[in-house]
UniProtKB/Swiss-Prot annotation:
Activity regulation remarks: ATPase activity and YopE secretion are inhibited by selected small-molecule ATPase inhibitors.
Pfam family, one: ATP-synt_ab_N
Coiled coil as UniProt keyword: no
Biological source species: Yersinia pestis
Biotechnology: Deletion mutant may function as an attenuated, genetically engineered, live vaccine effective against bubonic plague. Mice vaccinated twice with this mutant at varying doses are protected against bubonic plague in a dose-dependent manner.
Assigned protein family: Belongs to the ATPase alpha/beta chains family. T3SS ATPase subfamily.
Name recorded for this polypeptide: Type 3 secretion system ATPase
One cellular component (GO) term of this entry: cytoplasm
Name of encoding gene: sctN
Lineage: Bacteria, Pseudomonadati, Pseudomonadota, Gammaproteobacteria, Enterobacterales
Loss of function: phenotype: Deletion of the gene does not affect the growth rate but causes total attenuation of the pathogen in a mouse model of bubonic plague. Deletion mutant is not able to secrete the virulence-associated V antigen (LcrV) and is attenuated in a subcutaneous model of plague.
A Gene Ontology molecular function term of the record: ATP hydrolysis activity
Length: 439
């Protein structure tokens, strides 16, 4: 009989790392979306198979915690068919997603599988869904502006390659239209878009009407609609980030868009409350505020490529102190505020420039660009200051030289701030127009 030392290394490694006895448990309790099962040896984050003895069920679930020697699991699909006879079989692995160039042009579900139920080619690699962010000292500094093709952003809220920004908007603020424009016009190699908690009707409409064949060609979509289980909606954000990380590791410039962080947080809230966590700020358990930086810090520069990320945040009643909005703004490198008032006036993109900011803009733009942007901001602020007086007929020309200048140029400024959804503006063209407006 061979000793372990006489077995070839690759076989020995497999034997040492494997479970020689198949472990099975059984469901002991089902409460809402949470399962409890006695399954020895499982780890948090590990996937398990749920099967009925008559093979009427085949479903995966993820271990999210433990309580009194029982594992707490959340299924990755619908719970119909689970019974007291359902067996729980650990897989010994965490959730991974298949990645590769074949994903370009594909629409995936929240778990990284084809949305239409089809089959994908053999992946180039498998990436874990949960990964650590790049070490702080290994990140390259953000030094290069990234042209997003939107004049108001490139000119006044310049985004750097590897920056993370939030797009804050109430319902109907025009964020979906802005995202579609960004996908078509951003000067990047690959775009990864996560649609989390969207209405099912809007998905195909967005792909065919807003995105179009041109936008889809260099994009990967990860979609988890509002009717999907909470675990799938929560995982969609991590799956999209893992796919973006693969393309970053190939040396590409990646644009990661997520719509929306609020619905991601709500899915995490459902999971946390089901696991028995105490509700804190407006009903959100502590795990939500731990998940947000764990997700967002994975974007950014690495030694190989970059992920520039824009996350949309639904703001309830324009309340920027709402917990998810407040926490997200503190994590990210800038914020773009969309105004319902501007959207109602058919001013698109409906960006409120004076309430928006890019935290890295001053580090990456030229001195002239910084001056022109500052001058235009001053004109916008001055016009806002005297707008009410203009509306009631109380402003007299000549009272304030800077106000006169702002009023005189406001038509041209608004024309520059507005941009059609299919209109592309190159970075240098944007700067030339910005210079003209402020001279």
């Amino acid at each position: 009989m061979l000793s372990l030392d006489q077995i070839p290394h690759h076989i020995r490694h497999g034997i040492v790392g494997s479970r020689l006895i198949q472990i099975r448990g059984r469901v002991t309790q089902v409460t809402g979306t949470l399962l409890k099962a006695v399954v020895p040896g499982v780890r948090i984050g590990e996937l398990c198979y749920l099967r009925n003895p008559d093979n009427s069920l085949s479903l995966q679930a993820e271990v999210i915690g433990f309580a009194q020697h029982q594992a707490l699991l959340i299924p990755l699909g619908e719970m119909y068919g689970i019974s007291s006879n359902t067996e729980v079989s650990p897989t010994g692995t965490m959730h991974q997603v298949g990645v590769g160039e074949h994903l370009l042009g594909q629409v995936l579900d929240g778990l990284g599988q084809p949305f239409d139920g089809g089959h994908l080619p053999e992946p180039a690699a498998w990436y874990p869904v949960y990964q650590d962010a790049p070490a702080p000292m290994s990140r390259k500094l953000i030094t290069t502006p990234l042209s997003l093709g939107i004049r108001v952003i490139d000119g006044l809220l310049t985004c750097g390659e590897g920056q993370r920004m939030g797009i804050f908007a109430a319902a109907g603020g025009g964020k979906s239209t802005l995202l579609a424009s960004l996908i078509r016009s951003a000067e990047v190699d690959v775009t990864v878009l996560a649609l989390i908690g969207e209405r099912g009707r809007e998905v195909r409409e967005f792909i065919e009407s807003d995105l179009g064949e041109e936008g889809l060609r260099k994009a990967v979509l990860v979609v988890a609609t509002s009717d999907r289980p909470s675990m799938e909606r929560a995982k969609a954000g991590f799956v999209a980030t893992s796919i973006a990380e693969y393309f970053r590791d190939q040396g590409k410039r990646v644009l990661l868009l997520m719509d929306s962080v609020t619905r991601f947080a709500r899915a995490q809230r459902e999971i946390g409350l089901a696991a028995g966590e105490p509700p804190t700020r407006r009903g959100y358990p502590p795990s939500v505020f731990a998940a947000l930086p764990r997700l967002m810090e994975r974007a950014g520069q690495s030694s190989k490529g970059s992920i520039t990320a824009l996350y949309t945040v639904l703001v309830e009643g324009d309340d920027m102190t709402e917990p998810v909005a407040d926490e997200t703004r503190s994590i990210l490198d800038g914020h773009i505020i969309l105004s319902r008032k501007l959207a109602a006036a058919n001013h698109y993109p409906a960006i409120d420039v004076l309430r928006s900011a890019s935290r890295v803009m001053n580090q990456i733009v030229s001195k002239e660009h910084k001056t022109w942007a500052g001058d235009l901001r001053r004109l916008l602020a001055k016009y806002e200051e005297v707008e009410l007086l203009l509306q009631i007929g109380e402003y007299q020309k000549g009272q304030d030289k800077e106000a006169d200048q702002a009023i005189e140029r406001m038509g041209a400024i608004r024309g520059w701030l507005c941009q059609g959804t299919h209109e592309l503006s190159h970075f240098n063209e944007t700067l030339n127009l910005l210079e003209t407006l402020t001279q």
